[in-house]
Amino acid sequence: METIKKNEVKTGKVIDLTHEGHGVVKVDRYPIFIPNALIDEEIKFKLIKVKKNFAIGKLIEVISESDDRVTPPCIYYAKCGGCQLQHMTYRAQLDMKREQVVNLFHRKGPFENTVIKETIGMVNPWRYRNKSQIPVGQSNSNQVIMGFYRQRSHDIIDMDSCLIQDRQHQEVMNRVKYWLNELNISIYNEKTKTGLIRHLVVRTGYHTDEMMVIFVTNGATFKQSELLVNKLKKEFPNITSIKQNINNSHSNVIMGRQSMTLYGKDKIEDQLSEVTYHISDLSFYQINSSQTEKLYQQALNYAQLTGKEIVLDTYCGIGTIGLYMAPLAKHVYGVEVVPQAIKDAEDNATKNQLKNTTFECGKAEDVILTWKSQGIKPDVVMVDPPRKGCDETFLTTLLKLNPKRIVYISCNPSTQQRDAQILAEQYELVEITPVDMFPQTTHIETVALFVRKEEE
């Protein structure tokens, strides 16, 4: 094998992309991963890390460009870790995401006949984030800086704009940055664990334009909060809620458990289809509202509701998808382990006069067995777990329920594929549709249809 040494400069042809969007060059079957390189490009790169089974390279020059290469429009792209694919055409991004799902499902497990649809993309894949979580820090000259983290670090890149955030969010960020400097408000220092302001979080209702601004603080005392509230109210009239979230933990967790309202309402509203949702500072709510409607519509297509079906919504959160389906179902039962989320789901059901819904707090595997003992037999089960996927106990319990259809939404196709192998005991994985919830990044969301085998 050809010798591979750190700091050596080499040339090669990119033959593949990793799930992180890095180009793959091979030297005698030894893989070298190079960020920002594209398939079929001839490149020059420097080896910056060499391990036994792989190496990492830094792109120096593109000798022969791919047709899929574009100039990243963001001036911070080379430094910031928020986006990974701005150097790639949007069509190529969608194709890459579908190909990753194909590789996961067609090459492992009994899923070679599963149909994998084209990725559902956006017409305009920018400015889509309805929630911005912006770290706050200080420069060496003690000026307030706000932006996003450098790749693989907690160094904040001071930014004036971000092309995937709502435009209003960057306007709020820039004004708050100015006011924090002007009022000389102390900023949290991650190393010394001292200072007050840790993060600025901004949420916007996509269809309502209501805005919530949250100051995440290291402790409850916030003496100049009234000054900031008055400035925000005056400059941004669509702000309907300003909150303080207290996080005095010495961890990377952004939000604490305790919040207080400094101005306006406790929650903002947004709509999906005909359903209105109340969203608090701590609520889980999909980041990309326009794509969420496409995701949920695809899930609804898979559910094939006629008005006669019992639907079970597991990992239901604030009831987002269950309430979306309720107008077309006989009854929706939702279960979630977070008590506040269940309260929000019940409030959202009441707000929308959806009386054919029942929500209960607890572990899904426990609650659905209780419902089973009460004679509740779901026709369709919705599954939308966190990135780690489903607990095996939950999946085996789900198999006991034996619904006709399972619609599984995932933000991590790797764990979805793992879970699918357990469900394959009784279910056929018929079809998967990738939905691009996070353009310019490597994140993939999928919705999958499982049908009980005896129904084929």
UniProtKB/Swiss-Prot annotation:
The active site is at C411. GO terms for molecular function: 4 iron, 4 sulfur cluster binding; metal ion binding; rRNA (uridine-C5-)-methyltransferase activity. [4Fe-4S] cluster binds at C74, C80, C83, C162. Disulfide bonds: none annotated. S-adenosyl-L-methionine binds at Q286, Y315, E336, D384. Keywords: 4Fe-4S, Iron, Iron-sulfur, Metal-binding, Methyltransferase, S-adenosyl-L-methionine, Transferase. Gene3D superfamilies: 2.40.50.1070, Nucleic acid-binding proteins, Vaccinia Virus protein VP39. Residues 3-61 form the TRAM domain. Belongs to the class I-like SAM-binding methyltransferase superfamily. RNA M5U methyltransferase family. NCBIfam families: rumA. This is Uncharacterized RNA methyltransferase SE_1582. It comes from Staphylococcus epidermidis (strain ATCC 12228 / FDA PCI 1200). The lineage of its organism: Bacteria, Bacillati, Bacillota, Bacilli, Bacillales.
